[in-house]
C-alpha cells in the first residue's frame, strides 16, 4: 500500500526532508509496561541538522477532552441502581465500562506526561533535546498538504544556519514502505523498533 508524502526543501540550498519520517506508530512505555500515546511534530534538530520527528506535548487539551468523554461514558453507564444491576448482570456492559476505564487511564497518563515533559522535547531520530520546535501556525505536520496548484508552497519557516526559507513543492509523491512501530521510554529515548508488515 502506498501513501502520499511530501518533501520540505530550502529555496537557498539543496536541503530536503521527507514527511514519511513521521509514519508509523510511536508510543511510550512506562516501567509497568503500560503504553502511552506519543505525539510527534516535524521540527528542526540541531544535532541531526535536519527536519526530524520531534516529541510534541501540544495536544494536552485534546487528551483532557477525551478523558472527560471517557469518564462521561462510565458515568452514564453507572448513574442509577438499575444500570449498576444490569452492568453486574451483563458481561458485555462490563467489557464496555472496562474499555472506557482503560482509555481514561491512558489519557490521564498522557496528560501527566505532557505536563511533566513540556519544554524537554527530544528528537526521535537521535535523542537530542537540542531542537527548534515548529508549533502553532509554524507547524509542519504529517497532514500538511499544499493548497497551491503548480506552485511551491512556502511555509514561512527559515532554514537554520542557511537563511533560506522552507517550502513544499506542489507535487506530492506516493511511497510504499513497511511501517514501523517504535517504542520509547518516558524520557523520550528509543527502546526498540518493530517493523510491521
Locations of regions flagged by a protein language model:
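Short recognition patches in nucleic-acid-associated and regulatory proteins
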Residues: 6-42, 47-103, 109-110, 117-156, ...
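His-enriched metal-coordination microenvironments in redox/metal-binding proteins
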Residues: 1-7, 197
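Extended, charged low-complexity segments
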Residues: 161-165, 169-197
Amino acid at each position: 500500500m502506498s501513501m502520499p508524502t511530501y518533501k520540505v526543501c530550502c529555496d537557498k540550498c539543496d536541503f530536503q526532508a521527507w514527511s514519511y519520517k513521521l509514519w508509523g506508530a510511536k508510543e511510550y512505555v512506562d516501567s509497568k509496561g503500560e503504553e502511552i500515546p506519543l505525539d510527534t511534530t516535524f521540527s528542526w534538530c540541531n544535532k541531526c541538522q535536519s527536519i526530524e520527528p520531534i516529541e510534541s506535548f501540544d495536544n494536552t487539551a485534546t487528551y483532557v477532552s477525551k478523558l472527560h468523554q471517557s469518564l462521561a461514558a462510565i458515568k452514564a453507564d453507572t448513574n442509577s441502581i438499575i444500570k449498576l444491576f444490569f452492568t453486574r448482570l451483563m458481561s458485555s456492559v462490563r467489557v464496555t465500562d472496562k474499555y472506557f476505564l482503560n482509555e481514561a487511564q491512558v489519557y490521564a497518563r498522557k496528560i501527566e506526561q505532557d505536563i511533566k515533559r513540556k519544554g524537554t522535547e527530544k528528537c526521535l531520530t537521535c535523542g537530542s533535546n537540542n531542537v527548534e520546535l515548529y508549533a502553532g501556525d509554524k507547524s509542519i505536520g504529517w497532514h500538511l498538504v499544499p493548497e497551491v496548484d503548480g506552485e511551491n508552497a512556502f511555509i514561512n519557516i527559515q532554514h537554520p544556519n542557511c537563511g533560506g526559507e522552507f517550502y513544499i513543492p506542489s507535487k506530492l509523491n506516493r511511497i510504499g514502505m513497511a511501517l514501523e512501530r517504535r517504542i520509547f521510554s518516558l524520557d523520550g529515548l528509543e527502546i526498540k523498533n518493530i517493523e510491521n508488515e
